[in-house]
């Protein structure tokens, strides 16, 4: 197993443990399907640099050691039940770039996004998740996002492509056509 795969597995395992221990007032569909959770999260992490993966794996290990549950914190932030966890200005910058990428995809693939990918509260969800990251991980992820933007890439599209590829589709367009056929029939 290569280092990226090992780090991704370590992260997904830690996150899934945290998801299983989210208090009852924060039910999530991901808790209902371990396979779906692992698919979505691993697909996202495949787009991260090895440095960002290593940093976030360290965050997960340190958080678990300290008794933190990033998933509980994230959902509490989404519902504005706790004050901001991290106020780094990088969070706003990352969210702005990611929202722009999402909007471009949403207009290009309306059926895919109607299925729940990148819902209307995407910015709140992302901001709440980013607040659980260490400053070290935020800096590394910001470098990943900035590099992708400079190269004209869309990391959101790359994440979705990896996810639907794991489901057996060749492209987002291929999946969008499948959804159009289902809706027409």
What do the PLM-derived regions correspond to, one by one?
Residues 1-47, 78-130, 165, 169-185:
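Short, flexible domain-boundary/linker segments around small modular repeats
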Residues 45-61, 90, 94, 130-145:
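Short, structured motif recognition centered on aromatic/hydrophobic residues
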Residues 54-90, 145-179:
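Repeat-associated, polar segments at repeat-unit boundaries in modular proteins
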Residues 122-161:
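C-terminal structured interaction module
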């Amino acid at each position: 197993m290569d280092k990226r795969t090992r780090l991704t597995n370590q992260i997904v395992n830690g996150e899934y443990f945290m998801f299983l221990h989210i208090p009852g007032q924060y039910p999530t569909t991901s808790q209902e399907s371990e396979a779906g959770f692992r698919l979505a999260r691993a697909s996202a992490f495949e787009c991260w640099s090895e440095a960002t993966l290593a940093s976030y794996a360290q965050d997960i290990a340190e958080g678990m050691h300290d008794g933190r549950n990033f998933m509980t914190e994230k959902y509490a932030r989404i519902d504005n039940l706790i004050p901001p966890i991290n106020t780094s200005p990088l969070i706003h910058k990352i969210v702005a770039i990611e929202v722009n990428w999402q909007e471009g995809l949403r207009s290009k693939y309306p059926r895919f996004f109607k299925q729940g990918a990148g819902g209307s509260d995407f910015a709140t969800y992302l901001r709440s998740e980013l607040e659980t990251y260490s400053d070290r991980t935020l800096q590394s992820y910001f470098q990943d996002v900035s590099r992708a933007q400079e190269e004209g890439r869309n990391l959101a599209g790359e994440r979705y492509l990896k996810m639907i590829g794991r489901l057996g589709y060749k492209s987002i367009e291929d999946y969008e056509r499948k959804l159009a056929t289902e809706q027409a029939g």
